Amino acid sequence: MFKLALNAGHGYETAGKRCLKSIDPKETREYELNRRICDKIAEILGGTDIKIIRIDNGKDIPIRSRAAMANTGDADLYLSIHHNAGIRGGAGGGIEAAGGGN
């Protein structure tokens, strides 16, 4: 069985990880956006032979600890979802992919 570790990057209270007030008056937290995507992925894959391992719990867990949790769960793939800054004045942006393992 294929095991997919899902992580809704960052915790709910991680400082600064929210939408710019100029485009979202509610300043939606990045965790909320990431969690919705992880929930949808888990829902879509729910009826398959893919086992979902959730690494997120709303707390700000260090990235090394998240990776260790995925490894402990013997995940075949670890997917960490993020919404990077960069819209209308933000400095960040982009998509990253990192590979590793054997």
Describe each model-derived feature in a short phrase.
Residues 82:
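Glycine-rich, N-terminal phosphate-binding loop of Rossmann-like dinucleotide-binding domains
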Residues 76:
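Short acidic/polar active-site loop segments enriched in Thr and Asp
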Residues 1-68, 73:
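Active-site histidine-acidic residue metal-binding/catalytic motifs
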Residues 13-29, 85-102:
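A short, glycine/acidic-enriched catalytic loop
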